[in-house]
Amino acid sequence: MLSVLNRKMLTLVSHCADMLELCFDDADAVNDTPYILHVQSSFAIWDEQTVLFENRDFYTMQSGENDSGAGQPFAEKLASLNQKLNGCCVAKAVVDRDWLCIGLDNGVQIEIDTDEEEKNDETWRFFKLDDTSPHLIAYRHRFEWIH
């Protein structure tokens, strides 16, 4: 299923709490439904030998904090990452039972490690953003389709 990512364009890197969200879309389709990758395990986004963003960069707000985002190091890092990656196309997507690696056409690598999580903890979820497509869910050493 992840082969559908080949030549898709990365259009957004965002987050929800401590979950990374990557959105992929066709570069030349007008009304295409995007694919979403939710990452809940260890990950790193690399450019050569430099880590651009990783799971340790996430900041979870405490109750009572304002979510203005502007001027916050986390928000600035995410905005900078979007500037660098927005519009890059997937050159390759490789998955095995312990990790997922997505290589972009600008040389940036997105590496997701599934081997660190507990056996039944969801590590990542890949799906088309519609109401009918199944979700591919990765757990430690196994995959599952959810309809």
Residue ranges: model-predicted function:
Residues 1-147:
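Surface-exposed, interaction-prone regions used to assemble/regulate multi-protein complexes
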